[in-house]
Amino acid sequence: RKVWLNEIIEYIKVKIENNQEINLNFICTHNSRRSHLGQIWLQMAAAYYEVELVKAYSGGTEETAFNPRAVAALQRAGFAVREGIGGNPKYEISSDLHTLRIVSFSKKYDNLENPKKHFCAVMTCSEADEACPIIFGADLRVKLFYEDPKSADGTDYEVNTYDERCFQIATEMFHVMKKVFMKLQKIK
């Protein structure tokens, strides 16, 4: 996994060195779980390490809804959540850290709210990776697959599985931003 994480680290580092905005779009099939967690945790880690040029997005090959189990995992991890209404509600995810605010809802990866060019496409599931052999506008495509917590839906270990996936993604996104931060400190 470190190889893929290092690709993301290097992408961010080069963009910073060139004083360019850094856009990463986390892509999964339904944009309901893993891609949202990747987006939110990367943005949180960027805020924590004060790497302000980083902007994280998410999308899917299909539009469904941000799964309430994944939302609940973020709440258990300490995020405040305000839920919208409808079949595909918009959630406002926030943290006291640097007044982080992210509006999350399920959308296709090429939605108007997502970057159209000069971004890193982070593929969080193999299904989306296979369904989209080409992501137009992406500077880089990284395969960073996560096991789908959906497999635990309705079981006794559902909460544990979602929390484990949330923690895994958080750990990896903080690793990425810590390495970027350390590289920036060496440059200064």
Where do the language-model regions lie?
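Short polar/charged helix/loop
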Residues: R1-K188
